[in-house]
UniProtKB/Swiss-Prot annotation:
Positions bearing Phosphoserine: 249
Bias (Acidic residues): 304-319
One Pfam family it belongs to: TFIIA
Designated name of the protein: Transcription initiation factor IIA large subunit
Length: 369
């Protein structure tokens, strides 16, 4: 048997089938491109099986080591190149070699003329306006010496912060996205409790901000209808008054009452759905699940083919099934005696261990168990 000629044989078989099928395709009005597509699909599936080496499969192009192609002194060694190698002139290896030679020539030229005078990158000079920078002392807030060595910070007065035009007295809260115009006066201001400013969503107690009494009146006017509605006691659910739910003792008692009510409802449902058995003293026999009656048994046909011993396929010594090896061939002669068979095969192909082999003539002996 041989595996080297399997790819060529498959190639001739494919060409023969395509040539004989072309006339049928033309008679049925099928385009020739469809036939070529079927041929390519057939060939790609054969390559995926990896049963042999096929001639239409693209052969990998060999790589050339740089050490054999390039000499640092003499340059490219043309004697080591293979003339039959495909696409050597346009390969990326030669492009890299040319780049390496260019870098080496630049280094040699730099060493001959001196490294210091060969190339000096221009030093960027600062503009004249950038060197003459004047600082205004009035723009920097004065820092007061602190005996505790803490980080001082400039204080700002309440008049230096301006609210946006759309900020009214009803909404004195400043968001993080609001802007405030800060003017530096260059003078020290003592921190005042009435002029504490913040930008984190706090109130600015300015002279234009509403007083606490006014806010209290607004809140009381808004909550008056809610207080009038709370006068009516609620008796139709588990949601209680907010004042009663606020204390931990009331919350625990309400939760315990709700749990007891839920348990009682579940018990009532289970009690109604329970069916008492009063038809006898034996309880287990009737409650057991019976097998379906219409299920056919294994020996319903009463045939020898249903024997469970015959279902197990014989295995080889390696533990694999015999069906893994496939033989497709012609036979010349067959002799059998009882359960022993002797055959003579010719012009066949056998598939073993993922590879296909061709043979011209073979003898086989079989014993049926």
């Amino acid at each position: 048997m041989s595996n080297s000629i399997v790819g060529e044989v498959y190639h001739h078989v494919i060409l023969d089938v395509i040539a004989n099928s072309r006339s049928d395709f033309e008679e049925n009005g099928v385009d020739d491109a469809t036939l070529r597509e079927l041929q390519n699909l057939w060939q790609s599936k054969l390559v995926a099986t990896d049963v042999a080496t096929f001639p239409w499969a693209q052969a990998p192009v060999g790589t050339f080591p740089i050490g054999q192609l390039f000499d640092p002194v003499s340059g490219l060694r043309t004697d080591s190149l293979d003339v039959t190698a495909p696409a050597v002139a346009n390969s990326p290896i030669l492009n890299n070699i040319a780049a390496i030679r260019a870098v080496q020539q630049m280094d040699t030229f730099a060493q001959q003329h001196g490294n210091s005078n060969y190339y000096s990158p221009p030093t960027p000079s600062l503009p004249q306006s950038a060197t003459n920078i004047s600082f205004d002392s009035s723009a920097i807030p004065n820092v007061q010496s602190n005996p505790n060595n803490t980080a001082p910070f400039p204080s700002y007065s309440s008049n230096s912060l301006q609210l946006p035009t759309n900020q009214t007295a009803d909404s004195p809260i400043i968001n993080d996205h609001s802007t405030a115009n800060v003017t530096s006066t260059g003078q020290e201001h003592a921190p005042d409790s009435s002029s504490t400013n913040s930008f984190g969503g706090l109130l600015l107690p300015n002279q234009n901000s509403p007083k606490k009494s006014e806010l209290g009146e607004t809140e009381s006017s808004n909550t008056t209808p809610a207080n009038s509605r709370n006068d009516v006691p609620q008796t139709d659910g588990a949601i209680h008054d907010l004042d009663d739910a606020g204390s931990p003792s009331n919350f625990e008692s309400n939760r315990f009452a709700i749990a007891q009510k839920a348990d009682a409802e579940i018990y009532e449902v289970l009690k109604k759905n329970r069916i008492l058995q009063i038809d006898g003293t034996i309880e287990d026999n009737e409650d057991e699940k019976k097998p379906p009656v219409d299920t056919p048994s294994d020996e319903a046909i009463n045939s020898d083919l249903d024997d469970p011993d015959s279902d197990e396929a014989p295995e080889t010594e390696e533990g694999s099934d015999i069906g893994q090896a496939i033989v497709l061939c012609l036979y010349d002669k067959v002799n059998h005696h009882k359960n022993k068979w002797k055959c003579v095969f010719r012009d066949g192909v056998v598939g073993v261990n993922g590879k296909d082999y061709l043979f011209f003539k073979a003898n086989g002996e079989f014993e049926w168990i």
